[in-house]
């Protein structure tokens, strides 16, 4: 009987301890009762927390805003010290469209050493004025698309600790960061990056962007890369490798302060889309496109549209534009090549140096006039109206090939 009692006691104790042993720490977010604060935890206390508890793993974050409805309540976010032990595989949209968020505390408690996807993490945080990324580990990240997009109040970002060695996609990374004045990208390793579309689009406060550190040998998409950088006054693209790029549409669209762009190193052999590439570059006066190969390009819509100060486009080739009425030169009022600009002739048919708006450039860099459009003598007459075979001493009446 004593043995049986002892056995039952041990069994009861074992059963009592099983739930405790079976429990595992869990990562979760608590939204405060008034909705103004979210806290990230990794512990066993989820059932005891006050507020709305949200899951992190395997779900779209329940606390964030949506594309059509931002979260305008959350003002503060904090990573609790317990969160140090958690290793998220993705931080996808963790603060997406939290448009009133002003502060993120405890970033040192966020361990991203195993995080591969950081898409849209801070996108739409329009009130956020600073981010402490000094402990941020991006060594495993392969996708950082939209990460800081529309962080409209950020004036600076310290990215010196960013390891981008495995990143393949950076599209919209800093898009619409309207207050950013500068970026130091010297720590960026972009040898594996394939997409940089709209990477700096809408960075309207930057006067200069140093992209000489960017390795673009694998990049195929540069669509809208600098679009809307309206204060950008200069850019050094001498290190850009564009051999694999297929999309350059809207690449410099709206760069209203640029007066020149050196594209002498650009290879456009595989580029298919150049729509709006220089659209609304209002202060560009000259473009040298003599190195451009457009044999595979199929779309040129509004390529030079509204370049109001553009007077010369150097190019020795006739471009084959599938749509001859694509408004390629619309609004280029000062443009003159083989012929002067005509507002009624703005399509791709004018993309040539023979009868269009391109200007030939010789190997020594000197612009040459198209010989077929140099006026020649068609007929010679004496003062009395008699037709002559050659110019005579005295008064001659000469009829030229251009009608003069």
Regions found by a protein language model. Give the residues of each.
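Acidic/polar residues in short coil/turn loops that connect beta-strands
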Residues: 132, 184, 382-384, 402
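Residue-level detector of functionally pivotal "anchor" positions at catalytic/ligand-binding pockets or at interdomain
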Residues: 361-384
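A short beta-strand micro-motif
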Residues: 29-31, 380, 398
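Negatively charged
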Residues: 20-363
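C-terminal tail/sorting-segment detector
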Residues: 3, 397-404
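Extracellular Ig-like/FN3 beta-sandwich strand-entry sites
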Residues: 393-395
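C-terminal trimerization/auto-chaperone modules of long, extracellular attachment fibers and adhesins
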Residues: 386-389
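Bacterial Sec-dependent N-terminal signal peptides
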Residues: 1-23
């Amino acid at each position: 009987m004593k043995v049986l009692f002892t056995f039952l006691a041990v069994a009861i104790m074992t059963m009592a301890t099983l739930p405790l042993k079976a429990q595992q720490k869990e990562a979760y977010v608590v939204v405060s009762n008034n909705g103004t604060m979210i806290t990230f935890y990794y512990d066993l206390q989820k059932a005891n927390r006050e507020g709305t508890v949200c899951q992190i793993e395997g779900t779209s974050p329940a606390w964030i805003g949506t594309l059509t409805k931002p979260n305008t309540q959350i003002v503060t976010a904090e990573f609790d010290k317990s969160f140090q032990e958690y290793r998220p595989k993705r931080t996808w949209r963790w603060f997406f469209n939290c448009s009133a968020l002003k502060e993120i505390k405890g970033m040192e408690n966020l361990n991203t050493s195993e995080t591969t996807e950081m898409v849209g993490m801070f996108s739409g945080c329009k009130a956020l004025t600073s981010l402490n990324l000094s402990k941020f580990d991006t060594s495993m990240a392969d996708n950082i698309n939209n990460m800081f997009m529309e962080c409209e109040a950020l004036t600076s970002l310290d990215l010196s600790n960013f390891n981008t060695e495995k990143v393949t996609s950076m599209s919209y990374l800093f898009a619409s960061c309207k207050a950013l004045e500068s970026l130091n990208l010297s720590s960026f390793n972009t040898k594996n990056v394939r997409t940089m579309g709209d990477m700096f689009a809408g960075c309207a406060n930057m006067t200069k962007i140093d992209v000489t550190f960017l390795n673009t040998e694998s990049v195929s998409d540069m669509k809208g890369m600098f679009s809307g950088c309206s204060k950008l006054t200069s850019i050094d693209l001498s290190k850009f490798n564009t051999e694999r790029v297929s999309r350059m549409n809207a690449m410099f669209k709206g760069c209203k302060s640029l007066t020149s762009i050196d594209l002498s190193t650009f290879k456009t052999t595989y580029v298919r889309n150049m729509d709006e590439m220089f659209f609304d570059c209002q202060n560009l006066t000259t473009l040298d496109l003599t190195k451009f190969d457009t044999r595979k390009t199929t779309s040129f819509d509004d390529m030079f549209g509204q370049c109001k100060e553009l007077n010369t486009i150097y190019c020795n080739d006739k471009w084959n534009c599938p749509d001859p009425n694509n408004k390629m030169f619309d609004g280029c009022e000062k443009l003159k090549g083989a012929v002067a600009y005509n507002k009624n002739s703005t399509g791709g048919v004018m993309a040539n140096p023979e009868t269009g708006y391109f200007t030939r450039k010789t190997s020594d860099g000197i612009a040459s006039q198209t010989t077929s459009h140099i006026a020649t003598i068609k007929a010679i007459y004496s003062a009395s109206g008699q037709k002559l075979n050659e110019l005579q001493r005295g008064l001659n009446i000469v009829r030229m090939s251009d009608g003069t």
